[in-house]
């Protein structure tokens, strides 16, 4: 056989092997944990017992209730303690490790309760406080209908110092002040809007202490766009007492509106992005998951962490559709985005109703 013929045969065999490799999909290897569950990385197996424990004993049997709301709040209050100029370790668990310092910051009012609830789980399991806070937040959101699987990375080292004070935005701060603080931490104005999808499953205890557990929208147990709709409605009342710092009038009895949410929904820097979230569940889910993942990595070296995102449960499907509350019409919308029309929504039938407090608050 001539060298020319041999070369041609080798090329043909190489092409055939290459074609076969392309045609046969690679089989992704998965680790089987002691309890039979599988994950992409064996190091993630330690999370399954923690998952079972918090679903049963922190989240009351995998509910989307008060402890989920507070755990999600804690992810932000821990992570946003980060500034390239002012210091802070970001998502490092310092709010638990140095709780006697950080829970006394004015912006962290009331957060001592969820810190106290989570500390025994951190002590019980082989996990750092920084990892536990972000893991619990991601698991909690997955309990909510319409929720998302927030990516989770394992391996944050223990915090070495408390966060500086004054890094958590307050509800009475101006839009410019909030965007400046968030910009310092690496977030654009639109990412601030995306993060605020968290208020779809949130409530306030301390803005008006007379009405603890008052939600920010009418569906606090569902991760949906009602928060973005209802913050654009004309305010009619204060659900409790008036003249509370950081509170604006709400459209519904039993629903509280933060002054910061009211202003961000109407500010030229954020209004159109805010409106774009209305009745756009895929966008809310995708943007929130991506931005929460970014926040959860503040102050961390991602290359040193392990991707354990597949441990996070799949959330229940969204129930219900975007709507105006009963008794409201599109004329009640204070539209601040001139670039696009406000989405066409219908109102629930019946008279105006009130929103009950979040159970367990």
Swiss-Prot record:
Its cofactor is heme b; Ca(2+). Its EC number is 1.11.1.16. It catalyses: 1-(4-hydroxy-3-methoxyphenyl)-2-(2-methoxyphenoxy)propane-1,3-diol + H2O2 = guaiacol + vanillin + glycolaldehyde + H2O; 2 Mn(2+) + H2O2 + 2 H(+) = 2 Mn(3+) + 2 H2O. One of its GO terms (cellular component) is extracellular region. Changing residue 194 to H/S: Complete loss of activity toward veratryl alcohol and reactive black 5. No effect on manganese oxidation. Ca(2+) 2 binds at residues 200, 217, 219, 222, 224. Disulfide bonds join 33-45, 44-308, 64-144, 272-337. The active site is at residues 77, 194. Mn(2+) binds at residues 66, 70, 205. Glycans are attached at residue 126. GO terms for molecular function: heme binding; manganese peroxidase activity; metal ion binding; reactive-black-5:hydrogen-peroxide oxidoreductase activity. InterPro entries: Ccp1-like (IPR044831), Haem_peroxidase (IPR002016), Haem_peroxidase_sf (IPR010255), Ligninase (IPR001621), Ligninase_C (IPR024589), Peroxidases_AS (IPR019794), Peroxidases_heam-ligand_BS (IPR019793). Heme b binds at residues 199, 203-207. Its main location: secreted. Residues 1-22 form the signal peptide. A versatile ligninolytic peroxidase that combines the substrate specificity characteristics of the two other ligninolytic peroxidases, manganese peroxidase and lignin peroxidase. It is found in: Secreted. This is Versatile peroxidase VPL2.
């Amino acid at each position: 056989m001539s060298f020319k013929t041999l070369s041609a045969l080798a090329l043909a065999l190489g092409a055939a092997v290459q074609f076969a490799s392309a045609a046969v999909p690679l089989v992704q290897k998965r680790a089987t944990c002691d309890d039979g569950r599988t994950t992409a990385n064996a190091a993630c197996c330690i999370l399954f017992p923690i998952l079972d424990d918090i679903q049963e004993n922190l989240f009351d049997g995998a509910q989307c209730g008060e402890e989920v709301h507070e755990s999600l709040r804690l992810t932000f209050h821990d992570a946003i303690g980060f500034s390239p100029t002012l210091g802070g370790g970001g998502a490092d668990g310092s709010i638990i490790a140095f709780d006697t310092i950080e829970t006394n910051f004015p912006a962290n009012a009331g957060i001592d309760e969820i810190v106290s609830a989570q500390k025994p789980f951190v002590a019980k399991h082989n996990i750092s406080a920084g990892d536990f806070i972000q893991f619990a937040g991601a698991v909690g959101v997955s309990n909510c209908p319409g929720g998302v699987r927030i990516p989770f990375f394992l391996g944050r080292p223990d915090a070495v110092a408390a966060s500086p004070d004054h890094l958590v935005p307050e509800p009475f701060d101006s839009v410019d002040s909030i965007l400046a603080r968030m910009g310092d931490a690496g977030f654009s104005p639109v990412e601030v809007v995306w993060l605020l999808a968290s208020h779809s499953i949130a409530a306030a205890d301390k803005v008006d202490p007379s009405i603890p557990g008052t939600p920010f929208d009418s569906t606090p147990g569902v991760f949906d766009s009602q928060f973005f709709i209802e913050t654009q409605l004309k305010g009619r009342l204060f659900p409790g007492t008036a003249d509370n710092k950081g509170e604006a009038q709400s459209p519904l009895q039993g629903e509280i509106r933060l002054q910061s949410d009211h202003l961000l929904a109407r500010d030229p820097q954020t209004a159109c992005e805010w409106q774009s979230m209305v009745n756009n569940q895929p966008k809310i889910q995708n943007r929130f998951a991506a931005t929460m993942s970014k926040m959860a990595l503040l102050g961390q070296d991602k290359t040193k962490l392990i991707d354990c995102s597949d441990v996070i449960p799949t959330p229940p499907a969204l129930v219900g559709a975007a709507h105006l509350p009963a008794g409201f019409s599109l004329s009640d919308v204070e539209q601040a985005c001139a670039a696009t029309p406000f989405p066409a929504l219908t109102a629930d039938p019946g008279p105006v109703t009130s929103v009950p407090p979040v159970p367990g608050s």
